[in-house]
Amino acid sequence: GYIAYVHQNELVKR
């Protein structure tokens, strides 16, 4: 899903 993608992206960003 799109939410999952954004969630993972945030984890990688930090």
Swiss-Prot record:
Domain of life, source organism: Eukaryota
Protein name according to UniProt: Unknown protein 22
